[in-house]
């Protein structure tokens, strides 16, 4: 089975690296960022702005609906009790729930992508709720606030971390990569101590450029750019180390963001020999690649 990161970064990357060019300032090509926190006195409340954008219990597998053979890893649930049980059983694994309807053409169109992801991403659980199946599923949709289908909700530790509706295969794959990536070369950082340890490993002669991707759990632009980060972590492995941190994961991460004066996400910090030598704020693929090349000493025109 191919790794989650390798498959998803290929599927989600709608723009090839070879064709990426730096965006010019202003205009429609400008990258997006999520306004995230304002500078204020230490101890003040931080308001995060969401940018526009063990096995599960035995249950009935989805039948029909465009699935056919090979969709046995997409598990259909029929009630709130079944969904809650599946979320508890998953523990810290990512769970992706599609809320669909039998009459929805768009639900049928996106389902093959869901099946393909379930085959490849062995560390992610995929569940399906047919909202018009019964009174129990209609009540579950009301509880979860589902007003349109297909609607995708992402859970970790039984906590809702992200949701989308009306999306296509590329965005679904990108979302699964962002919230479920544990296998790529991107180093996952969970505290200030993790950051300091990584920086220490790359001090002195032979040390690599460290690119730290700082984001939030719920951030559209952060999700958008992450497949590019995964690709770069492989193609630039000889010269550059890529890492990421979600500022809202815990108090240590949030304190680190404040100390680094991060006020918008995604922010990329470029660290060389223990010093922050620059930063890029935004989600533009071409702009990000150009900045990384520049801090690696490559002349960019």
Swiss-Prot record:
Keywords: Chloroplast, Disulfide bond, Electron transport, Plastid, Redox-active center, Transit peptide, Transport. Gene3D superfamilies: Glutaredoxin (3.40.30.10). Residues 32-44 have a biased composition (Basic residues). The record marks 220-221 as: Contributes to redox potential value. The record marks 213 as: Deprotonates C-terminal active site Cys. Residues 1-47 form a transit peptide. The active site is at residues 219, 222. It is found in: Plastid, Chloroplast. Disulfide bonds join 219-222. GO terms for molecular function: oxidoreductase activity, acting on a sulfur group of donors, disulfide as acceptor. GO terms for cellular component: chloroplast. InterPro entries: CDSP32, Thioredoxin-like_sf, Thioredoxin_domain. SUPFAM superfamilies: Thioredoxin-like. Residues 50-285 form the Thioredoxin domain. Its main location: plastid. Residues 17-73 are annotated as: Disordered. Thiol-disulfide oxidoreductase that may participate in various redox reactions. May act as electron donor to the BAS1 peroxiredoxin. Possesses low insulin disulfide bonds reducing activity. Belongs to the thioredoxin family. This is Thioredoxin-like protein CDSP32, chloroplastic. It comes from Oryza sativa subsp. japonica.
């Amino acid at each position: 089975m191919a790794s989650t990161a390798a498959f998803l970064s290929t599927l989600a990357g709608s723009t090839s690296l070879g064709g990426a060019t730096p965006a010019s300032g202003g205009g429609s090509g400008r990258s997006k960022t999520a306004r995230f926190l304002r500078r204020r006195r230490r101890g003040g409340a931080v308001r995060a702005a969401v940018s526009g954008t063990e096995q599960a219990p035995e249950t009935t597998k989805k039948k029909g609906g465009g699935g056919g053979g090979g969709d046995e890893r997409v598990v259909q649930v029929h009630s709130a009790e079944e969904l809650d049980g599946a979320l508890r059983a998953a523990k810290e694994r990512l769970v992706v729930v599609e809320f669909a309807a039998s009459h929805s053409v768009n639900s049928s169109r996106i389902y093959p992508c869901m099946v393909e992801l379930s085959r490849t991403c062995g560390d992610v659980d995929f569940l399906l709720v047919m909202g018009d199946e019964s009174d129990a599923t209609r009540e579950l949709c009301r509880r979860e606030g589902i007003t349109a289908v297909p609607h995708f909700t992402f859970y970790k530790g039984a906590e809702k971390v992200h949701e989308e509706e009306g999306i296509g295969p590329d965005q679904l794959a990108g979302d699964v990569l962002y919230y479920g990536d544990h296998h790529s070369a991107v180093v996952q950082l969970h505290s200030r101590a993790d950051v300091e340890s990584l920086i220490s490993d790359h001090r002195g002669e032979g040390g690599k450029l460290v690119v730290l991707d700082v984001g939030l759990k719920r951030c559209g632009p952060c999700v958008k750019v992450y497949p590019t980060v995964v690709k770069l972590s492989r193609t630039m492995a000889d010269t550059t180390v890529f890492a990421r941190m979600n500022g809202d994961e815990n108090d240590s991460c949030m304190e680190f963001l404040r100390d680094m004066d991060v006020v918008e996400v995604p922010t990329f910090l470029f660290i060389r020999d223990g010093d922050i030598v620059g930063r890029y704020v935004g989600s533009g693929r071409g702009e990000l690649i150009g900045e990384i090349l520049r801090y690696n000493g490559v002349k960019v025109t």
